[in-house]
From Swiss-Prot:
Provenance organism: Escherichia coli (strain K12)
Induction summary: Induced under nitrogen-limited growth.
Protein name: Bifunctional polyhydroxybutyrate synthase / ABC transporter periplasmic binding protein
Superkingdom of this protein's organism: Bacteria
Primary site of residence: periplasm
Length: 381
């Protein structure tokens, strides 16, 4: 992560969390502007260039006349930085970015009446506090999913059941040390993954929410992360690089998105994923509209299109995520009948979804500290 991302995170969160003021959303839509600029996670918006079966852009462009341009971002901090610079209409923001974008007035509330497919949303996500603030709705849910433990099946003939294989120095089932063979996510929000591990292994600390940590709890989590540093082969944020590391660099265990595991399995690589006993973090992503979007009509058209069942199912099949429209589970031959079950549709209540840590008057450690400390830890300090 660059220092620019870190600075933008700190600035965005230096504001007190209050109800954000923004322009009132439109009541009707004019003619589409002919263009749409979106910031998205890798693999989230495909037009058939990687695999021609996976294309949910071409038909949208034909039907609306909105030419879609995608800028991929590898971390939430990068998304916040890009939205701060401006020039984009939409962003597929995870919960650790959405509040920062709302409080930083980088996104505007939407009028859900202009999104006919809104009524098809999964009730579990409709009221998510990562995009509903002060009685206003800041965006359209897109996909959700878990951060799983991905492992090499040759190294682990029996699936590992705990995150300790990436946090604690040990010999793995093949008799070799895990030193230099495991990875961690290159983003401050990974502190929450370590907090889940500490919550399970040090119950006396009383961690209830891995994103809202007292100073004592936070220091215990940092201790685990500092100890982990000597085990780390690479702090990953680029999905392609992580997949290459599993194929070519001897990496055998790491947190990962289902996307990487699906891609590696499709190549015949010996990898699998597991939901460890300590639990997992996860992401519920929202398509959010920039406060100064130049193409708002195309943006509204896209938000509605993104909620069509087949698009939802196709994205879930490609990324290894879950649709926010339950009908998406049945609408995509690419996802298949069991796709939602395989990807974890019933895990929703067991996932600690990414959100922005907030101080709440000094009771908890704020995200600005998470950012500073995680950069130091990745640098070996």
């Amino acid at each position: 992560m660059s220092k620019t991302f870190a600075r933008s995170s700190l600035c965005a969160l230096s504001m007190t969390i209050m109800t954000a003021h923004a322009a009132e959303p439109p009541t009707n839509l004019d003619k589409p502007e002919g263009r749409l600029d979106i910031i998205a996670w890798p693999g989230y918006i495909e037009r058939g260039q990687t695999d021609k079966q996976y294309d949910w852009v071409t038909q949208f462009e034909k039907e609306t006349g909105c030419a879609v341009n995608v800028k991929t971002a590898a971390t939430s901090d990068e998304m916040v930085s890009l939205m701060t610079k401006g020039g984009y209409d939409l962003v597929t923001a995870s919960g650790d970015a959405s509040l920062r974008l709302i409080m930083g007035k980088r996104v505007q509330p939407i009028n859900t009446a202009l999104i006919p497919n809104w009524k098809t949303l999964d009730p579990r996500v409709v009221k998510g506090d990562w995009f509903n603030v002060g009685g206003k709705v800041y965006g359209t849910p897109y996909q959700w999913g878990p951060n799983l433990l991905m492992y090499n099946t040759k190294t682990f003939p029996t699936p590992p059941d705990s995150w300790q294989v990436v946090f604690v120095e040990q010999n793995l089932p093949d008799g070799k040390s895990n030193k230099g063979r495991v990875q961690a996510y290159d983003g401050p929000i990974y502190i929450a993954d370590a907090a889940l591990f500490v919550k399970a292994t040090q119950p006396q600390l009383g961690i209830s929410d891995p994103y809202q940590l007292t100073e004592e709890q936070y220091q215990a989590v940092l201790k685990v992360l500092r100890a982990q540093h000597s085990l780390i082969h690479r702090y990953w944020h680029d999905t392609t690089v992580q997949m290459s590391d599993f194929k070519n660099e001897g990496v055998v265990a790491s947190s990962a998105w289902p996307y990487q595991a699906n891609a590696l399995k499709a190549e015949g690589q010996p990898v699998a994923t597991v939901f460890p006993k300590e639990g997992v973090t996860g992401w519920a992503d929202t398509t959010m509209l920039h406060s100064e979007a130049k193409h708002p009509v195309c943006a509204y058209k896209w938000m509605n299109w993104s909620l069509t069942p087949k698009v939802q199912g196709d994205v879930a099949a490609w990324f290894g995520s879950l649709p926010v429209v339950p009908e998406g589970c049945k609408a995509s031959p690419l996802l298949g009948e069991k796709g939602c079950e395989t990807n974890g549709f019933n895990y929703f209540d067991k996932i600690a979804f990414w959100k922005t840590p907030i101080a709440e008057g000094g009771k908890f450690v704020p995200y600005s500290r998470w950012t500073q400390d995680y950069i130091a830890i990745m640098g070996g300090r």
